[in-house]
Amino acid sequence: MCKPRVWRIAHTIVHVGALLLGTSQLTTCDFSGIFATIQQEVAIKSPSIPGAIYGLVKAGDKLYATNGRLWEKELNGIKWKPVPFLDGQDKRIDSLAASNTCVFACVSGDGVYKYTAGTTSSQKESNTDKAQAVVQMSDGKVVLQCALGDEKTTPSDADERLLGGGQGYLVTSKGFYTLPGSASCEVISETKDVTCKAEAPILASACDGSNTYILTKDKVYCRYTNGSGSTPTTWCDVEHKVSEPLALAVFKNKGETFLLVGGQQGYGEIKIATASGSSSSSSCVPLTAENVHATTGWGANCSTPEGSAEQYRSTIGRWAVSGIYVIKKDTSGGRKKRSTSTDCERPDLYVAVGDASDTYTGLWKFDTATNTWNRE
């Protein structure tokens, strides 16, 4: 049975509208005249999922994505298919989260609906009528972003959006918040961490298991987090060199960790530095200027390998990347791993693309068999 812990947040915040921009607003560049060359190099597939993508999650052995309705495919499958979920109810799914085999789909202002593979019913979660978004936390929990009513809303927090979080913390568009030691309550009371120097608006957040990263217009900030989730003594930051940043994700491959920063034209990459000696337990050292790359394709182990850089530049590198989704390989079904470390097995990489003409808007994936980017 699927019984995730679902929380409501006491801090009044509203719908994640900034993440649901029309694709025509994501970029204004004119890319006409280049696509014949692209098609000669790699045959671009017709999209399985039409239109802009607002979320992608893994639940059990399946992937789920939304363009307003729910779609699914097998983890190692090729084609996406629509799920008979909320059909005929005139409901638009704005965000997704997952816990075990359950998918939680938020219809902004209406509520959160739970879907489990193989079911046909649409079960609305209790006490979610004012949900504005559902967010997947780095520790596996699912958190709801809720407006608590007009009488509780103030101008200062009317545009605050929940972005992410993990053990002992939440990240919103206006700050980093620490949570009380007990997580059993339905409504969370949070305290803003004044040591976080990131200036609002915060655009996205990500976690690599040890550190939490926060994206702003010009910089990425890092908060060191040990296993107990205690407060760090330092923050560090670095300029990311990405124009008009939109998304942030952690990508691990062959024992190395990278931050991927989606922007107006493709995405940049920051290799996470490894602390030496005992310093890793007491100081924040992952972000260094020499490891910042304005675009991917600069090395063998990065998310787009160096040998695939040209094909990346002629496709993903020309369009806005508004979402980055890193999916760990499923190695339980007889697939042989290259190493006993999960960080050595290259994960699958998907991006949500926005093309000004909408011709190439949609979900794209890096194909490790051909080492090329192509549309899903």
Curated annotation (Swiss-Prot):
Q: Where are the transmembrane segments?
A: none
Q: What is its main location?
A: membrane
Q: Is Disulfide bond a UniProt keyword of this protein?
A: no
What superkingdom heads the lineage? Bacteria
Determine if Transcription regulation is one of this entry's keywords: no
The lipid modification S-diacylglycerol cysteine is placed on 29
UniProt subcellular location: Cell membrane
**Where are the N-palmitoyl cysteine lipid anchors?**
29
Q: Which family does it belong to?
A: Belongs to the TP013X lipoprotein family.
Protein name, entry field: Uncharacterized lipoprotein TP_0134
Species in which this protein is naturally found = Treponema pallidum (strain Nichols)
Give the source lineage, highest ranks first: Bacteria, Pseudomonadati, Spirochaetota, Spirochaetia, Spirochaetales
